[in-house]
From Swiss-Prot:
<keyword id="KW-0349">Heme</keyword>
<feature type="binding site" description="proximal binding residue">
    <location>
        <position position="87"/>
    </location>
    <ligand>
        <name>heme b</name>
    </ligand>
</feature>
<dbReference type="GO" id="GO:0042744">
    <property type="term" value="P:hydrogen peroxide catabolic process"/>
</dbReference>
<protein>
    <recommendedName>
        <fullName>Hemoglobin subunit alpha-2</fullName>
    </recommendedName>
</protein>
<dbReference type="Pfam" id="PF00042">
    <property type="entry name" value="Globin"/>
</dbReference>
<dbReference type="GO" id="GO:0020037">
    <property type="term" value="F:heme binding"/>
</dbReference>
<comment type="similarity">
    <text>Belongs to the globin family.</text>
</comment>
<dbReference type="GO" id="GO:0005344">
    <property type="term" value="F:oxygen carrier activity"/>
</dbReference>
<dbReference type="GO" id="GO:0005506">
    <property type="term" value="F:iron ion binding"/>
</dbReference>
<dbReference type="GO" id="GO:0043177">
    <property type="term" value="F:organic acid binding"/>
</dbReference>
<dbReference type="InterPro" id="IPR002338">
    <property type="entry name" value="Hemoglobin_a-typ"/>
</dbReference>
<keyword id="KW-0408">Iron</keyword>
<keyword id="KW-0561">Oxygen transport</keyword>
<dbReference type="GO" id="GO:0019825">
    <property type="term" value="F:oxygen binding"/>
</dbReference>
<dbReference type="InterPro" id="IPR050056">
    <property type="entry name" value="Hemoglobin_oxygen_transport"/>
</dbReference>
<dbReference type="InterPro" id="IPR002339">
    <property type="entry name" value="Hemoglobin_pi"/>
</dbReference>
<comment type="subunit">
    <text>Heterotetramer of two alpha chains and two beta chains.</text>
</comment>
Amino acid sequence: VLSAADKGNVKAAWGKVGGHAAEYGAEALERMFLSFPTTKTYFPHFDLSHGSAQVKGHGAKVAAALTKAVGHLDDLPGALSELSDLHAHKLRVDPVNFKLLSHSLLVTLASHLPSDFTPAVHASLDKFLANVSTVLTSKYR
């Protein structure tokens, strides 16, 4: 459960991301593919090279979903219900991959927002991404 302080930290940090959300989403995906090569198996039809339009496009989708989640911190299940259905029933993504992408996103944010990425903000973003991951995997059961 996100505390009021966590919610404030998440909103403030995502606000700093601003217009770079799609760019950071794509960078986090590239980072995940490089650091955890097995994640590439879910994207056999993608050009996974650096800067590919497909990775940028999916990065924008990831960023848009996270932006939506930040705007609905008190109702993540409602805000992410369709994505949860998609990932559980159609794409059948192994739940561990959400943790890997979350880690890659945290590293990406820390590299771009070093002065804003305090231990408290890091902890809040980590909790937020864990909650998002939990929601996205909730329909696997």
